[in-house]
Amino acid sequence: MDKRFQLVSQFSPAGDQPQAIEQLINGLKSGLAFQTLLGVTGSGKTFTLANAIAKLNRPTLILAPNKTLAAQLYGEMKEFFPNNAVEYFVSYYDYYQPEAYVPSSDSFIEKDAAINAHIEQMRLSATKALLERKDVVLVASVSAIYGLGDPTAYLQMMLHLTVGEIISSREILQRLVDLQYNRNETELSRGTFRVRGEVIDIFPADSEKEALRIELFDDEVEQISVFDPLTGQGIDKLARVTVYPKTHYVTPREQILKAVDAIKVELNERKKEFLEQNKLLEEQRISQRTLYDIEMMNELGYCSGIENYSRYLSGRSEGQAPPTLFDYLPKDALLIIDESHVTVPQIGAMYKGDRSRKENLVNYGFRLPSALDNRPLKFAEFEKIAPQTIYVSATPSDYEINKSQGEIIRQVIRPTGLLDPVIEVRPVTTQVDDLLSEINIRLPLKERVLVTTLTKRMAEDLTDYLHEHGIKARYLHSDVNTVERVEIIRDLRLGIFDVLIGINLLREGLDIPEVSLVAILDADKEGFLRSERSLIQTMGRAARNLNGKAILYAARITGSMQKAIKVTEDRRELQNKFNIENGIIPQGLSKQVNDVMQLGQKNLKKGNLKQGKVAEYKANYQIHSEQDILKQIALSEKQMFACAKNLEFEKAALFRDEVTKLHEQLVSIG
């Protein structure tokens, strides 16, 4: 029997949650393809969904509009389902510059990227969970609609080993190379293996902290064990194990040879076309680049940019949808689109932007026409393959309402009895000084403030201004990388700083109960940042606090402002009426501050190590065990050398200082 979801929570459904859960389950069981959950900010939509998932017991994919919200959802689901597989799938690029050609300046931009190894491991862990288990909740960004390796080839390439199996060490090593693992005798890191006599150590690409040891005797698997690659200490013994490929883009050798033949045919056709049009430079360019890729594929089984040949590698026909994360989903999967009013338009926009860039590469001989099939899904393709879907939003758009045929499940009453925030409109002429005085009122109460501006420059200038007046403030915008965004929000909740300034990221889903004031600067500047939906979403960030207030600074009241204020006031009236009728006294939310990127990792012994944050190098370690200190020294030294190798010398210096402090601590307890 499949493992069931086990929901862990100290709370029971309350407010509008019980009827919302019941309606969702009834709709899904009766075969409704689309449902919309309209839940106000702070009404516990995530808890409602977790209850529905647990009762239905179906694998679930949750799409979030950005990495920050995906990380927050991942953390919440990890808390609700600690005994099940909660996984995280977002783009693994910290920095990404796709290859492009600008005809006007005749300049070709090479592909350049910085891959986050931790997120790459989480992606591989996510697909592994989908293939192995049914009790999976997978939180993903729109990255889920981009091309991924074909699941059929991925499954074919897996290496299965069983104790007692007859297999030579040479055969195992060859299979590991086929899976794109690298041999490294000096350092066992993720995606590598080492050989010592008849003992093969493998650090699986999808594993974070545990490696495998395969012990052979006379071409027979004698023992399979799990060990800590940092200390070498054994953890467990296994009867069988499956080693998954290092990347999603692995292909069996025979498929690569078939693909190479097909690529050669297309190359000859393309060369002929260019010569007929007297495009000699383009003909020479496509020949040189493609023949180099073919040679790499013949020799190594892969090449840089192998995804551009995905049509041939996956055996799909021209124009057919590429394999994506959706191909890895089980047939009975459930799809939840969070903040659907933002996420759905994103899904529709991805294809066109990608297409226009690739057409230039194809037209000027940098890529074969088949590269156009390495793309995100078109919106129609997404609609076709999407399983049963629940749209979730406080402000659903017409698309979701039409898809649900007007059947909206409403969740307006909060379990805590909290009301929507009080709204005030104040003059724009004195907005910065007025904001400063409002911040100073909240600092003694240990309450936090969110401020939303219209531009990055304005956010940065306002941060500097507040610093000059002794206010601890930070800004959050698109230039801040994924992990750092999560850390900034965590630091705000912990009180390391008091004011967070943003543009478009301080909206959907941000769950910060400590925030009692949301200030919207230049609220009368009509546009997508100050539309009715944007204003409702932004003001909603103060709805999780007992003293929640939203201040709109404006010279006039626009149509969007008027509508947003009316919706909020109507909800507030409804919530207040419910509280009076049921004798409910509003209670502020008290939510534990977790580092979502650490959730699910096997923690070291409690009390031994105060865990530093993901992006924090000078962590304040209070370690009482010598073994833990030695382990942390080894880890910090490894990170120090990695930073130095990437020419990130400032980070390397921080890790060096950390190692020095740990050595001092080791001496003091010795």
Swiss-Prot record:
The protein, known as: UvrABC system protein B
Compartment(s): Cytoplasm
Pfam families: Helicase_C, ResIII, UVR, UvrB, UvrB_inter
Location, primary (coarse class): cytoplasm
NCBIfam families attached to this UniProt entry: PRK05298.1, uvrb
Gene expressing this chain: uvrB
Domain (Helicase ATP-binding) ranges: 26-183
Residue positions binding ATP: G39, V40, T41, G42, S43, G44, K45, T46
Summary of subunit composition and partner proteins: Forms a heterotetramer with UvrA during the search for lesions. Interacts with UvrC in an incision complex.
